[in-house]
């Protein structure tokens, strides 16, 4: 089934190429759409194009490793609270409780407070 092959290419693009080739996912998704719209036999060109590009791409398992680490931490600490400075403060009560206190947008500077709950930081 050509859709199954194209679907596996989409998964491979993130799972095995990931950040080493940021264009791989876009190509794989475009290939999947082409297979759906064009159909066989012409979609073979799209499948071969994508297969060759994915095979030639540098590979990285960084996304898989980081995702698995994040899932393991979430399972280990299922009830860790969101740090107060990251919580939305739409009411005066929430502001008085310290929600969103000291929050600064991350871009352009080092964030001294961090984003992880205290118990996870210690792990």
Label the model's feature ranges:
Residues 1-122:
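Terminal-proximal interaction/regulatory segments of ATP-powered molecular machines
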